[in-house]
Every structure is written in structure tokens, then in C-alpha cells.
């Protein structure tokens, strides 16, 4: 769990973590130089529970870097990430560990709750959730959130080090899809708290845009495609990703046509996260003749 100035909801989340029914767990809490009482709260828990390892960042490093510190410190064969303001159901880890099978990563549905903890719906009400069996599923996006994941150690070498310009859960999911795939578990196992200080909210279609111009947007997409191509194991999927990165870097008609043909050929995989019909995802690929998205 990564913490930063989260004392308002922290005790409730830590209590839910320590109450997990799975028999053998270690808890790694990494505080990112909080200025509130978060660190003191964690120290009090660590003094009472030998399963807790507490790491203190001397200076603030940000959420992504803090999660990487925690992952590198983990000793278990499977790892789960926790936000500081949610509440886990007691059976979360046990059910996911039992269901992960040969997959590299499994993620659950989440219940949405308001700032007071009252459940208001499901994450799947706003987002299409599905399996991601191969790397091409991550070309345009994904709806697998980090707080709902359980993943195997086998993905760490592909996923780390994290890049600051993409989400940590995105690259973890991509690494898993590149190896033995990502499995969706439809049961809600986390109360995902929605409030004004969320880093990412439940409706991913309304996320903050990290660009101001089309040129800047295109440059970010190329950078992301180059990253995942470099992390993808050798094979046909890696070559497709490299080709897309080259084509997205150019605005020429030839490049737009090439990326359209590539996406049209692989539209089921690349647009799986949108939950469109087969025809709908095919027609969506025509947009690439005009723009990136």
C-alpha cells in the first residue's frame, strides 16, 4: 500500500487489509513523506503486527515510484496493490488467488462507494470489464484497475521500472497480457471510494487529458507505444506494436492508411476494452484515417 496524507480513511483500509482471510500474507506499507498523521498511524499498526513492513520515503516521490518501491520489497509469489482510501472485502485475496490459475494477473470488479463509504453502484456499471489475453489488448486502453489486481512475480521484470507517463496499473496489466494473460473476476471485492481527492476516478472515459494540442497528444501516444513495444516479448505482437509506433509518429496519408489497416485487422483485440460489437469495433478503426483516436 502506498500512502500520502491519507489519514482520513487510512485506519478503515488497514483494518480491512489485516482482516483478509487468506492464511499467509505480508503487508508492505510505503509512506511517501506524509505531512499528516498517516505515518504515525502506520507505525502504530506495525508495532502490533509482525506481518507489516513499513518503509518511509525521506522525500516525496509520487504514487507510481512509491508503488514500485513496495513491489520491489515484496517477497511473495503473488502481489496485490492497495490504495489508502478503499475497503477490501475479507475474502478478496483468497478468492483471487484461488481463481488466477495459469493467468499472470487477475482483477476483480469493484463496488463504488461515496466519501462516507455508502455503496452507490459497481465499477462495471460504467466500464466494460473483460479478459485481456494478449499484448494487443493494451494498444488503446484498458479498464483493469490496480486496486483490484492480484499478479504473479513473473511479470515484474517486464513491468519495472515504471514509466512516469503511463499508469502503473496499465504497465502491470500489459506485462501480464504479454505473458500468460489477464483474467477478469466479476465479483465485487473492493469498495472503491469516490471522493474529491481520488487520483483516478471510476469513470475512465472522463479522465484528465494530459495534452493540450493534437501534436502533443500524438507524441504521447507514440511514446507509450514505443514503451510497450520495448517491453513486449519477441514475436508477432511486438512487431505489430513497433509498426504502430512508427505509423502513429507520422501524419502522412500512407501512415494513416497503414495504421487503419493494422487496427482493422486486429480490431477485436485492440478494442476489446470498449465492449463494442464486432462490427462496431471494426467501424471504429476507420477513425484512424483521420485522427489518432
Describe the residue ranges of each PLM region:
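Nucleotide-sugar donor-binding/catalytic module of glycosyltransferases
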Residues: 1-205
Amino acid at each position: 500500500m502506498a500512502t500520502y496524507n491519507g489519514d482520513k480513511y487510512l485506519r478503515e483500509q488497514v483494518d480491512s487489509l489485516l482482516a483478509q482471510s487468506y492464511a499467509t500474507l505480508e503487508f508492505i506499507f510505503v509512506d511517501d513523506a506524509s505531512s499528516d498523521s498517516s505515518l504515525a498511524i502506520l507505525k502504530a499498526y506495525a508495532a502490533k503486527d509482525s506481518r507489516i513492513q513499513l518503509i518511509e520515503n525521506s522525500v516525496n516521490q509520487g504514487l507510481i515510484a512509491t508503488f514500485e518501491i513496495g513491489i520491489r520489497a515484496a517477497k511473495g509469489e503473488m502481489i496485490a496493490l492497495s490504495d489508502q482510501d478503499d475497503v477490501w472485502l475479507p475474502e478478496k485475496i483468497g478468492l483471487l488467488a484461488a481463481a488466477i490459475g495459469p493467468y499472470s494477473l487477475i482483477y476483480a470488479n469493484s463496488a463504488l462507494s461515496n466519501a462516507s463509504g455508502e455503496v452507490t453502484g459497481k465499477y462495471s456499471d460504467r466500464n466494460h470489464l473483460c479478459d485481456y489475453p494478449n499484448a494487443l489488448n493494451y494498444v488503446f486502453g484498458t479498464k483493469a484497475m490496480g486496486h483490484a489486481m492480484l499478479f504473479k512475480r513473473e511479470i515484474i521484470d517486464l513491468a519495472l521500472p515504471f514509466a512516469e507517463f503511463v499508469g502503473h496499473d496499465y504497465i502491470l496489466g500489459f506485462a501480464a497480457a504479454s505473458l500468460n494473460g489477464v483474467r477478469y473476476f466479476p465479483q465485487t471485492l473492493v469498495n472503491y471510494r469516490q471522493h474529491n481527492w481520488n487520483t483516478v476516478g471510476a469513470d475512465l472515459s472522463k479522465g484528465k487529458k494530459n495534452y493540450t494540442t493534437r501534436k502533443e497528444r500524438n507524441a504521447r501516444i507514440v511514446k507509450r507505444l514505443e514503451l510497450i513495444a520495448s517491453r513486449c516479448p519477441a514475436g508477432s505482437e511486438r512487431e505489430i506494436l513497433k509498426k504502430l509506433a512508427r505509423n502513429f509518429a507520422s501524419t502522412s496519408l500512407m501512415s494513416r492508411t497503414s495504421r487503419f489497416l493494422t487496427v482493422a485487422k486486429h480490431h477485436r483485440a485492440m478494442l476489446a476494452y470498449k465492449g463494442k460489437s464486432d462490427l462496431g469495433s471494426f467501424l471504429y478503426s476507420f477513425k484512424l484515417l483521420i485522427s489518432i483516436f
